[in-house]
Amino acid sequence: MAIVKCKPTSPGRRHVVKVVNPELHKGKPHAPLLEKLSKSGGRNNNGRITTRHIGGGHKQHYRLVDFKRNKDGVAAVVERLEYDPNRSANIALVLYKDGERRYILAPKGLKAGDQIQSGVDAAIKVGNALPMRNIPVGSTVHNVEMKPGKGGQIARSAGAYVQIVARDGSYVTLRLRSGEMRKVPVDCRATLGEVGNAEHMLRVLGKAGAARWRGIRPTVRGTAMNPVDHPHGGGEGKNFGKHPVTPWGVQTKGKKTRSNKRTDKFIVRRRSKK
């Protein structure tokens, strides 16, 4: 993995910082594991914008990544590592002994030729997936399920990991990167190790056009708008003279947005109380 700073041959190249991984496959992805991916432009089925700052960008195919890791007792070998335009992490194409191929998230340290396995009998080794009742306390894991059999939901982005800090009865306690402590059923699966490509955070796009290639549209400040468009808009000068709010008048910068009281009992400690 190399960090490359581009030379200032033009204004658009001056600030670009690239993350180059020579181990990534340079050819086409595995076609049977691709699906069409349509652009939403941030609109819902009514055509109304539900997520701002989304639109345009390069076409992509969706890679069918195996988040469940439920092919138990069959060893697999890593054929190659690949770039995935739909996520910050890299993915690995694995070939099982019965001939099936699947994509998985590529953990840190995994390389072509390595062997991996899933199931209760899998060894405690990076890349192996097994229920958390079989993983030692103190281990670092990623792609963690919140419900048994649902597939991994926690710690899937580049460099992400979770630590198992306790096991009590039918639950394990996890420490998330945010500092939050959370309980999850012991039969939920997790993959050992942390997600690779942690250097993703060091990249610098360098110009607005690079964000547009990724489907990210400009973010306009409310104070730069007119009063008809935003509560911060209008007035003389830059001060908007009130507590910051969203375009719809809801308080921002610190307001709690979580509303799922049913699962509050599984949160042992909030992230704000590190």
Curated annotation (Swiss-Prot):
The Gene Ontology biological process annotation of the record reads:
cytoplasmic translation
Q: Which GO terms describe its molecular function?
A: rRNA binding; structural constituent of ribosome; transferase activity
Which UniProt keywords are listed? Ribonucleoprotein, Ribosomal protein, RNA-binding, rRNA-binding
Q: Which Pfam families match?
A: Ribosomal_L2, Ribosomal_L2_C
Q: Which GO terms describe its cellular component?
A: large ribosomal subunit
The annotated region (Disordered) lies at 221-274
Disulfide bond sites:
none
The record's listing under InterPro entries reads: NA-bd_OB-fold, Rib_uL2_dom2, Ribosomal_uL2, Ribosomal_uL2_bac/org-type, Ribosomal_uL2_C, Ribosomal_uL2_CS, Ribosomal_uL2_dom3, Ribosomal_uL2_RNA-bd_dom
**Key word Nucleotide-binding present in the record?**
no
Q: How does it assemble?
A: Part of the 50S ribosomal subunit. Forms a bridge to the 30S subunit in the 70S ribosome.
- Can you tell me which family this protein belongs to? Belongs to the universal ribosomal protein uL2 family.
Function recorded in the entry: One of the primary rRNA binding proteins. Required for association of the 30S and 50S subunits to form the 70S ribosome, for tRNA binding and peptide bond formation. It has been suggested to have peptidyltransferase activity; this is somewhat controversial. Makes several contacts with the 16S rRNA in the 70S ribosome.
NCBIfam families registered for this protein in UniProt: rplB_bact
Protein name as annotated: Large ribosomal subunit protein uL2
